[in-house]
Amino acid sequence: MCTGVRFSDDEGNTYFGRNLDWSFSYGETILVTPRGYHYDTVFGAGGKAKPNAVIGVGVVMADRPMYFDCANEHGLAIAGLNFPGYASFVHEPVEGTENVATFEFPLWVARNFDSVDEVEEALRNVTLVSQIVPGQQESLLHWFIGDGKRSIVVEQMADGMHVHHDDVDVLTNQPTFDFHMENLRNYMCVSNEMAEPTSWGKASLTAWGAGVGMHGIPGDVSSPSRFVRVAYTNAHYPQQNDEAANVSRLFHTLGSVQMVDGMAKMGDGQFERTLFTSGYSSKTNTYYMNTYDDPAIRSYAMADYDMDSSELISVAR
C-alpha cells in the first residue's frame, strides 16, 4: 500500500512525496537518469529530442531504470501506487497509439514532459501495456502525477483509461479515485477549529481540548482511511515559505499515515510497514528520502550530479 501527496508554495514550487508501504524492500535507491542517457522504450514510444534529467527512487532491472517515483528539473513528478483488483492493462501494443510499458511509464512521463497539462494531453493517445520484468509479478498500479499547479490520477481499468483531476492533491490505493472523493463527503463536518461550548438541555458541555473537531477522522491504515486522513492534513497544514519548512511539512503530512510494523498483516502473514518516504522540491531540484530503519532525512540535489552524462547514476544510501 502507498500514499502520495502534492502541494506548492507561494512561489509555485512543487513539493511532491510518497510513502511506499510493503513487507520487504526491493533494494531501491536514488537513481539519476541524466539527459544524455539513452535507452530504448519497449514499444518505441516517442519523446523529446532533448529529454529531461530525472531523479527519483527505483531499482535497475534488466539493465533499465525502473522508478517507483521520480521528478524532473521542471517540477513534474510522478509516483506509482498499488491498485490491485481494479488495474487492468492490455498485454499487446495497440496500433495507432503511443504504446508505453507499465514499468517504464514513470520515467517516460518525467523524461518527456514539463507539466501536468502536457501529460494529460499526451495521454489521449497512450496505451499502457502490461510488461512483466523477468522474475517479477505484474505491477497493478495507478499513478499520481503533479507539478506546481495541480495533480492528476491515471487509472487504467477494464473499461479504459481514466484521468482524474485531483483537487485534494493526494492518493492512496484501491478502490477507485472516484470512490475516495465520494467518501470524503462523510467527513464534511470535521474541523480543525476549537469546539465551541454548547448546551444539551440543562447541561453545559465544553471540549476536552484541541482536536475535538476532528472526531470521526479514521485512524486505521486501510486505503480509504489513509486517503481521508492525508487529504485532511494536506488541506489544513498552514502555508510555509521556505525549503526546510516545506520539506518538514511534506514528511510530517506523510507521517500522519505511515504504517508501523505489527499494525497490519498482509495476506501472506507478513506485516506491512512504510519502507521509505520520499519527496521532491522543485525549488532546489532536490530529492529527499528516509527509511523505516533510518528516519534521518537525506537529501540528493540534481546539482550534485552531472545531468548531461550518458551514464545512469545509482546513489548509495
UniProtKB/Swiss-Prot annotation:
Family assignment from sequence similarity: Belongs to the peptidase C59 family.
GO molecular function: hydrolase activity; transferase activity
Residues at the catalytic site: C2 (nucleophile)
Effect of W22F: Decrease in both hydrolase and acyltransferase activities
Organism: Bifidobacterium longum subsp. longum (strain ATCC 15707 / DSM 20219 / JCM 1217 / NCTC 11818 / E194b)
Induction of expression: Up-regulated in the presence of a mixture of unconjugated bile acids cholate (CA) and deoxycholate (DCA).
Binding sites annotated in the UniProt record for taurine: N82
Pfam family, one: CBAH
Catalysed conversion reaction: glycocholate + H2O = cholate + glycine; glycodeoxycholate + H2O = deoxycholate + glycine; chenodeoxycholate + glycine = glycochenodeoxycholate + H2O; cholate + taurine = taurocholate + H2O
Biological role stated in the UniProt entry: Possesses dual functions in bile acid metabolism. Acts as a bile salt hydrolase that catalyzes the deconjugation of glycine- and taurine-linked bile salts, which occurs naturally in the intestines of humans, releasing amino acid residues and deconjugated bile salts (bile acids). Can hydrolyze the amide bond in all six major human conjugated bile salts, namely glycocholate (GCA), glycodeoxycholate (GDCA), glycochenodeoxycholate (GCDCA), taurocholate (TCA), taurodeoxycholate (TDCA) and taurochenodeoxycholate (TCDCA). Shows a slight preference for glycine-conjugated bile acids as substrates.
Domain of life: Bacteria
Binding partners and assembly: Homotetramer. The tetramer consists of a dimer of dimers.
EC number: 2.3.1.-, 3.5.1.74, 3.5.1.24, 3.5.1.-
UniProt protein name: Bile salt hydrolase/transferase
Positions of transmembrane segments: none
Binding site for deoxycholate: C2, R18
Pathways involved: Lipid metabolism; bile acid biosynthesis
NCBIfam families: bile_salt_hydro
Keyword annotations of the record: Hydrolase, Lipid metabolism, Transferase
InterPro entries: CBAH (IPR047711), CBAH/NAAA_C (IPR029132), Ntn_hydrolases_N (IPR029055), Peptidase_C59 (IPR052193)
Protein's GO biological process: lipid metabolic process
